[in-house]
Amino acid sequence: MIGEWNNGTGRRKSSVARVFLKKGSGQIVVNGKAIEKFFGRATSIMICKQPLLLTNHAETFDIMVNVAGGGESGQAGAVRHGITRALIDYDATLKPELSKAGFVTRDAREVERKKVGFHGARRRKQFSKR
């Protein structure tokens, strides 16, 4: 462990999360608010805590997160990715376990752009034969 804080940057869709963790009691603060206050849905909170629960470190670290961009789902995914990277920065032996669960890999799916002459990314205008 180098220094007191371990950090990791997580990304998902258009969200970016900078995560800092240090030894503590398991408190998670996102953008200055408790995680329960910041994320409205329980599923988002669960997504954020998955790497900690998998590695049995849920009550080991105090985590401070700065997250920006995107919506609730993207931000939760970015926080999970950032926590995963910070845990690997803390202890590299956790990487195989986290990698097997699929938390280390950055989810590269992005919104496809709308094309000219289409209603959306792929939805075409209605075809009229006559």
UniProtKB/Swiss-Prot annotation:
A biological process from GO: translation
Entry-linked Pfam families: Ribosomal_S9
Leader sequence residues: none
GO MF term (any one): RNA binding
Keywords: Ribonucleoprotein, Ribosomal protein
GO CC annotations, alphabetized: cytosolic small ribosomal subunit
Family, similarity comment: Belongs to the universal ribosomal protein uS9 family.
Protein name: Small ribosomal subunit protein uS9
Organism in which the protein naturally occurs: Albidiferax ferrireducens (strain ATCC BAA-621 / DSM 15236 / T118) (Rhodoferax ferrireducens)
Gene that encodes it: rpsI
